[in-house]
From Swiss-Prot:
PANTHER family in UniProt: 30S RIBOSOMAL PROTEIN S20, SMALL RIBOSOMAL SUBUNIT PROTEIN BS20C
HAMAP family in alphabetical order: Ribosomal_bS20
Record family assignment: Belongs to the bacterial ribosomal protein bS20 family.
InterPro entries recorded: Ribosomal_bS20 (IPR002583), Ribosomal_bS20_sf (IPR036510)
Functional description taken from the UniProt entry: Binds directly to 16S ribosomal RNA.
Protein name from the UniProt record: Small ribosomal subunit protein bS20
Stretches for region Disordered: 76-98
Organism (species): Trichormus variabilis (strain ATCC 29413 / PCC 7937) (Anabaena variabilis)
Taxonomy, superkingdom: Bacteria
Amino acid sequence: MCANNKSALKRAQIAERNRVRNKTYKSSVKTLMKNYLSAVQAYAANPTPESKQEAQTRLAAAYSRIDKAVKRGILHPNNGARKKSRLASKLKPIEQTA
């Protein structure tokens, strides 16, 4: 850190702390999204009520984590809405054909 005074040093420390905290949240959002997408692929390959329920459960978990990230200011509200919309659009056409 190349801070020239006390307040700049403190701001740099806070920024680093927040960066690490935000990174863990963003990482968990991405992980839950990937888990959901894999469940959707499994449901598309073998459309059973159990696989549909699994996909819906994982969708709810991803929605919850995205909403919490938005609430805490880690994701912009529009970014969170876009992620949720894209997740929902993956399952919708498969449900209608099955």
